[in-house]
Amino acid sequence: MPPKTKEKGTKAGAQKKKRNAGADVEAESMRRLALLEKEVLQDCLALQRDEARRAKASEDQLKQRIKDLEAELEGARSEGKAIYAEMSRQCRSLQEAMQSRSRQLEEEVEGLREQLELCQREAEAAQREAKQALGERDQTLAQFRAHVADMEAKYEEILHDSLDRLLAKLRDEASVGRGCAETPHQAQGAAPPVWTQPPGSLKL
């Protein structure tokens, strides 16, 4: 394994070079910053001089404009009185028109409010009628279902009675026929068909 002394010396030299390079970079940065500040100050001074010249020119123009406006104002004072009188007349006319329109709108609002109240009362009455009609419909449907169920029960009872009578008649006929001629099926002891469905189980 090589000795570590040489590696330590190499690292120390590299770190020294880095420090020197960092110092050079910092010095260059400071120099550039100073130049930049100088340029900025020069630009600011030039800008201030330009603004001062423009402000002076604007001040002169403003003074001249004020003089012109004063002259125009003096010449328009007489016209201003007439204009003021005309505007006052128009303002009064406009106020009267606004008051008339306001009264008209108030009347329209009152009429619409009355119509709304009437519509609400009619809607409430219609809702009550609809609710009552639904109740009557439900009651009628319940009565109809009860009637249908009663009719079904009666029809089942009638049908079962008819079937019972028919079976009894068939048994009687079978008993009579057994005395005359015995079929092979009956000879083996087979019982005649019997209705086994209980009453009430038949669905129409």
Swiss-Prot record:
GO cellular component: cytoplasm; cytoskeleton; motile cilium
Primary subcellular site in the record, as a coarse category: cytoplasm
Keywords: Cell projection, Cilium, Coiled coil, Cytoplasm, Cytoskeleton, Flagellum
Ranges of compositional bias, category Basic and acidic residues: 1-10
Region (Disordered): 1-26, 175-204
Top-level lineage group: Eukaryota
Presence of keyword DNA-binding: no
Subcellular location: Cytoplasm, Cytoskeleton, Flagellum axoneme
Coiled-coil positions: 45-159
Protein purpose: Component of the nexin-dynein regulatory complex (N-DRC), a key regulator of ciliary/flagellar motility which maintains the alignment and integrity of the distal axoneme and regulates microtubule sliding in motile axonemes.
Quaternary structure (record): Component of the nexin-dynein regulatory complex (N-DRC).
Family from the record: Belongs to the DRC12 family.
Stated name of the protein: Dynein regulatory complex protein 12
Species this protein is from: Bos taurus (Bovine)
